[in-house]
Amino acid sequence: MANVKLFDQTGKEVSSVELNEAIFGIEPNESVVFDVVISQRASLRQGTHAVKNRSAVSGGGRKPWRQKGTGRARQGSIRSPQWRGGGVVFGPTPRSYGYKLPQKVRRLALKSVYSAKVAEDKFVAVENLSFAAPKTAEFASVLSALSIDSKVLVILEEGNEFAALSARNLPNVTVATATTASVLDIVNADKLLVTKEAISTIEGVLA
């Protein structure tokens, strides 16, 4: 079992927390992480690109001139692709770029990125993040007390709405729950700030 320091909201070290080696202490598999990041980035693409082919372009229903006798090349429509203002051949159409990888691969990628953050000492465990009301300034003071001044992913337990609302308006702060934190979120963050309850949930999901 790997141990990490456990802090309270004031930045004081209160104890330590044991992490499951099978989740937070494995050798990171970079190729699997790469595959999952590419998959998740592909799923974020809108895919709303579209062009008009010759059947969608307005006009062009009449043959521009007769078939024979003019000396010019035969033409059937002024919306053929070779005409200015004509349709596009084999242009992009709306589509989804998303694709799914096997669950085993996704789980291994999550374990890999969590393990990498722990190994790099970029995993900050906090006893809890409790707020009486949504207060951005209070959350900012928590980050300051924990010496977090770079891009951070805050991983909360389910239902901690006040903490989520307090953090969401801060620059360089991303909020997720233990079940929704993605490989892409973790890779993009310089540090992870994880509550003790969220750690238990992560271990329960990935064990």
Swiss-Prot record:
Gene3D superfamilies: 3.40.1370.10
GO term, biological process aspect, one: translation
Keyword RNA-binding: yes
Annotated Gene Ontology cellular component terms: ribonucleoprotein complex; ribosome
The UniProt record lists the keyword Hydrolase: no
PANTHER family assigned: 50S RIBOSOMAL PROTEIN L4 (PTHR10746), LARGE RIBOSOMAL SUBUNIT PROTEIN UL4M (PTHR10746:SF6)
Designated name of the protein: Large ribosomal subunit protein uL4
Origin species: Streptococcus agalactiae serotype V (strain ATCC BAA-611 / 2603 V/R)
Gene name, Swiss-Prot/TrEMBL: rplD
